[in-house]
Amino acid sequence: MSGKAQQQSRLKELIARGREQGYLTYAEVNDHLPEDISDPEQVEDIIRMINDMGINVFETAPDADALLLAEADTDEAAAEEAAAALAAVESDIGRTTDPVRMYMREMGTVELLTREGEIEIAKRIEEGIREVMSAIAQFPGTVDSILADYNRIVAEGGRLSDVLSGYIDPDDGSLPAEEVEPVNLKDDSADSKEKDDEEEESDDSSDSDDEGDGGPDPEEARLRFTAVSEQLDKAKKALKKHGRGSKQATAELTGLAELFMPIKLVPKQFDALVARVRSALEGVRAQERAIMQLCVRDARMPRADFLRLFPNHETDEKWVDSVLKSKPKYAEAIERLRDDILRNQQKLAALESEVELTVAEIKEINRAMSIGEAKARRAKKEMVEANLRLVISIAKKYTNRGLQFLDLIQEGNIGLMKAVDKFEYRRGYKFSTYATWWIRQAITRSIADQARTIRIPVHMIETINKLNRISRQMLQEMGREPTPEELGERMDMPEDKIRKVLKIAKEPISMETPIGDDEDSHLGDFIEDSTMQSPIEMATSESLKESTREVLAGLTAREAKVLRMRFGIDMNTDHTLEEVGKQFDVTRERIRQIEAKALRKLRHPSRSEHLRSFLDE
């Protein structure tokens, strides 16, 4: 049975079940649909066709009363017709190889988010970041480094935004979404191009890292960092007095984490702390791998035995002795490698002393940090996937500007991911309102950087866009193209600068651009090559060479060679008197005499008449 016949059979079974039950659920419809159908609009069309047959589709199985109200009959012919129609729908969309359609089809499988859904995902992102910050606070030296940077900025009068970007307190209160005028993403108006240029200019001129606020409140930052500093001192005293595993130290470290984790660090600071914790784990892993290779690969110790015996004994120098007590068959090899194993264990002990943590504590802190990162990463992924349609709707406005549509989409996706990182749901705006500007800026910046063969700086792109906009306005006002002088007066710019901008704004043209209807003719065929000689010049040059050779043939061999070397005839370059003298092993004065004698011979009318015609030309 062919694939299409099988699909029709499955769809007939679905319709038969609907006739028998009197209804279908969305889950049943989804289970019987072909796998290639994933676009929500296609699914809605299929459900509408099933409804037209008299079979109602419910979210969940309805009760008996609802079935009585919605009861309807279907016939066999209608079932076959619907199955054939559904199979035809599948065949139309299931075989596309267009990357844009495939991307949109996959994108359509993700449902749009409500305002509540956006807040829920944003809270999960913040929760993941707080878990990472809580784990970082447990690592010695991390909080100290942030406090040192904060104190340095306060002392030097720097910007707080170089350290932190805000706070993520774990409260449930959030402002309601404001009634913001929706962004018009359709390109229907007559002045849409002018609006696009204005938007592009404003997007390019904005700083990519500026969120439009004045940064963190200095007073609130002072209070928070003071509390963190005081709690850090308490934690250090408890650690010194009672040890890390004590109840007192654990309580103080927990309090430190509670104060530190709401601080939202800038990416540079956050990544530096994460890298610091990761570095300690990588050091542990490197020594553990070295010990495992010595035991498993070199000593032929079974891997299962190593994984059973080695954990929790990473720095125990008596571990080798405990392994040898059972006298395994690999005991002799282990004994032979004892010194190498002890050397790596000592490196682990030195690492523990350096970071003031045991190997188990380093692993536990990294595990907690990884869990928080994974939680935030999953939530960000959901937010990005649910807003991919927004990127496409914005990217459509910027087609035919030098970048392919898929490139525009990917650049917009980069802006979308940055918007997810910086989104603050407590401000009350919907995510789409905030993300629109990041997406638009990412797209316009990429067009400015990549669209032109010869890259033009962004500030010059702004000037070109402004010039084009004013030029169109003056064209509508005057009914003709404005002159550079008129543009300069309107833009308050010197005329020479206007001419430079107009020259820069010109797009390069490919030499392979076809000319006319004949595909064999290209623009390069009609452009003069100034480096090539004309046929007449080439013929004259060849005739001059031949005449010169004939004239030189009338001299002695020595005189001819001296002239050839002195004037570079049939050579790459000419030579000085001294260079020619070395060649003939005579003085430069003698070469000058030979040259003068040869030139007198050439000036004789019998010889000079052959070359005089070239001089006249």
UniProtKB/Swiss-Prot annotation:
Region of interest (Disordered), ranges: 170-220
Family listed: Belongs to the sigma-70 factor family. RpoD/SigA subfamily.
GO MF, one annotated term: DNA binding
Annotated segments matching region Sigma-70 factor domain-4: 551-604
Main localization category: cytoplasm
CDD domains assigned: Sigma70_r4 (cd06171)
A biological process from GO: DNA-templated transcription initiation
Region feature Sigma-70 factor domain-2, mapped onto this chain: 383-453
GO cellular component labels: cytoplasm
Localization: Cytoplasm
Name recorded for this polypeptide: RNA polymerase sigma factor RpoD
Keywords, ordered alphabetically: Cytoplasm, DNA-binding, Sigma factor, Transcription, Transcription regulation
Alphabetized InterPro entries for the sequence: RNA_pol_sigma-70_dom, RNA_pol_sigma70, RNA_pol_sigma70_r1_2, RNA_pol_sigma70_r2, RNA_pol_sigma70_r3, RNA_pol_sigma70_r4, RNA_pol_sigma_70_non-ess, RNA_pol_sigma_70_r1_1
Biased composition (Basic and acidic residues): 184-195
Superkingdom assignment: Bacteria
Oligomeric and partner information: Interacts transiently with the RNA polymerase catalytic core.
Residue ranges the UniProt entry marks as DNA-binding: 577-596
Sigma-70 factor domain-3, as annotated region: 462-538
Function: Sigma factors are initiation factors that promote the attachment of RNA polymerase to specific initiation sites and are then released. This sigma factor is the primary sigma factor during exponential growth.
Positions of short motif Interaction with polymerase core subunit RpoC: 407-410
